[in-house]
């Protein structure tokens, strides 16, 4: 960990803007959730599309972005609702590990299919260690699926060449435990059942591992950013 306060660390969006050329790019955010990254990409001059499998999350994204409701499509990473060679960039931000384990490699192939030659596959994945991970591990231990996501990238098609790899310290905040619980369940509604039995322990770890700061309680968690270019 650095000596910088968690809330002063560059955000994931800051990291992407520093590594990628976004202006004018047709960028696909796979697993876009409530659309925060889609809106950021547009602010950076990109032409973004969000793909999301959860109806409730699509509704949230469209409500937050009423002038661009058509920018959000229902779909999954392993079967993208997009034409061949139609995108300059495909981004999986904290989403590749949510693809079913036996279809992660297919999701990488789908990215290859929709990318133009010279297009980029961009993947941000949380590392399965650290204070933040320990909080969520009780309700949903993602150690294995996060490792499988990296393995799927390592087994990528030969058309992909890795051009950038960076592990960095990340942070995220919640106003309180109730917000954390809501967001975790919004991402995967099946987690509601787990909270019934382990919610008290999740809250204990949240208060133990979190750091009070601007806007609420902050948690630390390292991120691995990998970028690949489609060469053929």
Identify the meaning behind each predicted range:
Residues 122-147:
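Conserved class I S-adenosyl-L-methionine
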């Amino acid at each position: 960990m650095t000596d910088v306060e968690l809330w002063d660390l560059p955000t994931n969006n800051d990291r992407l803007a520093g590594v990628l050329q976004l202006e004018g790019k047709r960028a696909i955010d796979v697993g876009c959730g409530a659309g925060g990254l889609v809106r950021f990409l547009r602010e950076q001059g990109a032409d973004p599309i969000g793909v999301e499998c959860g109806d409730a999350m699509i509704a949230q994204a469209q409500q937050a972005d009423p002038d661009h409701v058509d920018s959000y499509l229902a779909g999954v990473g392993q079967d993208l609702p997009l034409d061949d060679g139609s995108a300059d960039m495909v981004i999986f931000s904290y989403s590749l590990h949510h693809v079913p384990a036996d279809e992660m490699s297919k999701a990488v192939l789908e990215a290859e299919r929709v990318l133009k030659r010279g297009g980029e596959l961009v993947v941000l994945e949380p590392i399965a260690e650290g204070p933040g991970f320990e909080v969520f591990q009780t309700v949903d231990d993602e150690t294995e699926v996060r490792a499988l996501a990296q393995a799927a990238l390592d087994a990528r098609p030969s058309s992909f060449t890795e051009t950038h790899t960076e592990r960095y310290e990340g942070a995220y905040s919640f106003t309180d435990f109730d917000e954390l619980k809501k967001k975790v369940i919004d991402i995967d509604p099946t987690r509601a059942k787990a909270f019934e039995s382990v919610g008290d322990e999740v809250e204990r770890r949240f208060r133990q591992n979190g750091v009070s700061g601007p806007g609420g309680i902050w948690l630390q968690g390292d991120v691995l950013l990998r970028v690949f270019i489609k060469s053929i």
